[in-house]
């Protein structure tokens, strides 16, 4: 636990970078076409690589303030996509053009899908940013 408290931003950056690379591997190497909601989740995750990387490099204690909105938006989108994969009738018109957002290309152990991986990544980043915020408030 002390490692997490000491390196929370570095761990969050590693998660964001891994998620970015994995999404690129899925789409470019494995040729899995991303749906609209996957693109929106990428738009939330990719800036986190830069924000957390720069914040870590500059030792900016406010980095959680900058990164938190991106992580929350990505988490909400991933929850919505998990929901429409479980209940396809609840799909909005946003996914009506191109690849269906209810399509489940990856299904490990019967429940781990690409949006579930995204959800776990965003949730872990939010928890690590919260740890940073607590640490920041204690130092005041």
Curated annotation (Swiss-Prot):
Keywords: Cell membrane, Chaperone, Disulfide bond, Electron transport, Membrane, Oxidoreductase, Plasmid, Redox-active center, Transmembrane, Transmembrane helix, Transport. Disulfide bonds join 35-38, 95-101. Required for disulfide bond formation in some proteins. The chain crosses the membrane at residues 6-25, 40-59, 66-83, 110-134. GO terms for molecular function: protein-disulfide reductase activity. Pfam families: DsbB (PF02600). The keyword Chaperone applies. It is found in: Cell membrane. Its main location: membrane. The gene is bdbC2. The keyword ATP-binding does not apply. Belongs to the DsbB family. BdbC subfamily. InterPro entries: DiS_bond_form_DsbB/BdbC (IPR003752), Disulphide_bond_form_BdbC (IPR012187), DsbB-like_sf (IPR023380). It is a multi-pass membrane protein. It comes from the Bacteria. GO terms for cellular component: plasma membrane. This is Probable disulfide formation protein C 2. GO terms for biological process: protein folding.
